[in-house]
From Swiss-Prot:
It comes from Saccharolobus islandicus (strain L.S.2.15 / Lassen #1). Its EC number is 2.7.4.6. It comes from the Archaea. SMART domains: NDK. It catalyses: a 2'-deoxyribonucleoside 5'-diphosphate + ATP = a 2'-deoxyribonucleoside 5'-triphosphate + ADP; a ribonucleoside 5'-diphosphate + ATP = a ribonucleoside 5'-triphosphate + ADP. GO terms for molecular function: ATP binding; metal ion binding; nucleoside diphosphate kinase activity. One of its GO terms (cellular component) is cytoplasm. PROSITE patterns: NDPK (PS00469), NDPK_LIKE (PS51374). The active site is at 117 (pros-phosphohistidine intermediate). The gene is ndk. Its cofactor is Mg(2+). The lineage of its organism: Archaea, Thermoproteota, Thermoprotei, Sulfolobales, Sulfolobaceae. This is Nucleoside diphosphate kinase. One of its GO terms (biological process) is GTP biosynthetic process. Belongs to the NDK family.
């Protein structure tokens, strides 16, 4: 196994609904380490950078407005094969496709209010971490 770090963000609906502790607890029970954590109100500029790959898509504006609508909790999480482990733990973007026992399967309300974001590759994780954390935070 290879020790990796990834970026995870609890979205405004997860924060508003009081799911922060439950979500973090799931990661810790899985043996993953929270390296850094902060609650922020994301600027539009950062949101556009975070979701840059979706620029030009029909849902881009709604997504940016949503993630800037309230506080989010940003985390850097470390563990063996952590990118894939967390992707499996959070489940499909569409909660109808996310099995029970996954974070989205248990808590997501819709495709847009789906509680959580997690990087889907090491490269994206590094880019996304750098949007929210300085090297000294890690």
């Amino acid at each position: 196994m290879v020790m990796q770090r990834t970026f995870v963000m609890i979205k405004p609906d997860g924060v508003k609904r009081g799911l922060i502790g439950e979500i973090i607890s799931r990661f810790e029970k899985r043996g993953l380490k929270i390296v850094s954590l902060k609650m922020v109100k994301m600027s539009r500029d950062i949101a556009e950078k975070l979701y840059d790959e979706h620029k030009g898509k029909s849902f881009f504006e709604e997504l940016v407005n949503y993630v800037t609508s309230g506080p989010v909790v940003c985390m850097v999480i470390e563990g063996d094969d952590v990118v894939q482990v967390i992707r499996r733990m959070i489940g499909n973007t569409d909660p109808k496709e996310a099995p029970p026992g996954t974070i989205r399967g248990d808590y997501a309300l819709s495709k847009s209010e789906n509680v959580i974001h997690a990087s889907d590759s090491i490269e994206k994780a590094q880019r996304e971490m750098s949007l929210f954390f300085d090297k000294s935070d890690l």
